[in-house]
Amino acid sequence: MQKAVQLDVFGRVQGVGFRWTTKLVADRLGITGTVSNQPDGSVKIIAMGPDAILEQFIGAVKASPTPSGRVDRVVQTPLQDVSACHKFSVVG
């Protein structure tokens, strides 16, 4: 079953390659959506994919896909009404 979530990721997640390594993980797993830096220093991820694969992706995000990053907290919000994406993009 397809699922969509918003992940608000806090920690050392800007200026360390976090968005680009998140994209690599998403592409490898077949996850679609976006990742973007936020003004408060966090990173916002909108991710869509099959339930089990999406859980793998979320686990990778929580573990920080980049060795120079650090994830302190992830706020996960299920999304209901999301436009379909055909790829995973770094925004901004």
Curated annotation (Swiss-Prot):
Leader sequence residues: none
UniProt cross-references to PANTHER family, sorted A to Z: ACYLPHOSPHATASE (PTHR47268:SF4)
Designated name of the protein: Acylphosphatase
Species name: Latilactobacillus sakei subsp. sakei (strain 23K) (Lactobacillus sakei subsp. sakei)
UniProt cross-references to PROSITE patterns, sorted A to Z: ACYLPHOSPHATASE_1, ACYLPHOSPHATASE_3
Keyword Cell inner membrane appears in the UniProt entry: no
EC number(s) per entry: 3.6.1.7
Broad enzyme group: hydrolase
Keywords, comma-separated and alphabetical: Hydrolase
Any one GO molecular function term: acylphosphatase activity
Gene that produces this protein: acyP
Boundaries of every Acylphosphatase-like domain copy: 4-92
